[in-house]
Amino acid sequence: MKMVSRVIPVQAFDLVVFGGTGDLAKRKILPSLFRRFVAGQMPNDAFVIGVARSELNTKSYQDLVISALKEFEPELVASAELEIFIKQIKYVQIDAQSDFGWSDLASKVRKNAIQAFYFSVSPSLFGQLAEKLHQYSIASQSSRIVLEKPFGRDLSSAQALNAVLKEHFSEDQIYRIDHYLGKETVQNLMAVRFGNMLFEPLWNSQYIDHIQVTVAESVGVEGRGSYYDQAGAMRDMIQNHLMQLLCLIAMEPPAKFSPDAVRDEKLKVIRALDPISSSDIVRGQYSNSGSEKSYLEAVDNPSSKTESFIALKVQISNWRWAGTPFYLRTGKKLKARCSEIAVVFKETPHSIFGPDAGSHRNALVIRLQPDEGMTMDLTIKEPGPGGMRLIDVPLDMT
């Protein structure tokens, strides 16, 4: 059965993207907005205001947006909607650390429209942006601010950042998001777990041998060396994307499908995590290959100890998962780009087919990228004569 996207109409809005010329905006935010526009979800009276330090005007920024869409949404740029979409793009040059440009931004954000401010910038600027939005009366009590990772470097810095933001915005105005949760197959994981009696009775350590969560990237740091060398794979990927996936896999059924109920169950998983031993962690850096730079060369830091690859074994001490290991791994410059979750079930307690039948396990494999989908590996008899020979075949559940 093919997945169907249902369009939920939204009201007119002004979306202000701080860091509007950055990598995240060009690769993810702007292409996503254009996809929603083509799908009919973004109204014609909604506007996207790119904000950055670059010396651009609205026309040159629109050209930048078109270039980004050609690179990251090549199949859609030929559509007739592109010309209409581009007219809804504006640009304001500002300096987050001075008063330059803020009055111009205040004049462009409509007071009668829904307002969202996307902080696609370094977390060190979050507090200053919140202060400026308040100082120039740009944001209102109904405005939202959207924050991507990383949210602080550690617990104390995250708490300090929360305190600064809450000086100007209430908790229900602050959206700390993880874009991995927007993937169709990630959302489908909730439906598979809690919408089917088939899986939930088996979703525990009695039947599941182990679970693997893999996010492999074929690219290197790609111009993000200064940021990445401060963060590393652990902070860049494990503590946000992979931990979110771990929580969705391991959490108990929430009382209802609501943000607060789901969050509460995720928190229980995190509290049940065992401390991770150094013997259960593997860290590494990619080396050079031909004309391609090594990690140390890419970040221009020969003495860097920052990991570009990390794998760890995680244990959850509760009744459902005690004894079942979770393996999390992510890295750059790996053989192929692949993000998937593999739920590997235990072997049958006894094989009636004898030792020649081999070892077989069922596995539920959820692919997040590049090709979203879900398969269930089943053991069946190999067709044809020659006795009972067993093979594993994937059942496509997409």
Q: Where do the PLM segments sit?
A:
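Secretory/organelle targeting and membrane-embedding segments
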Residues: 1-146, 151-398
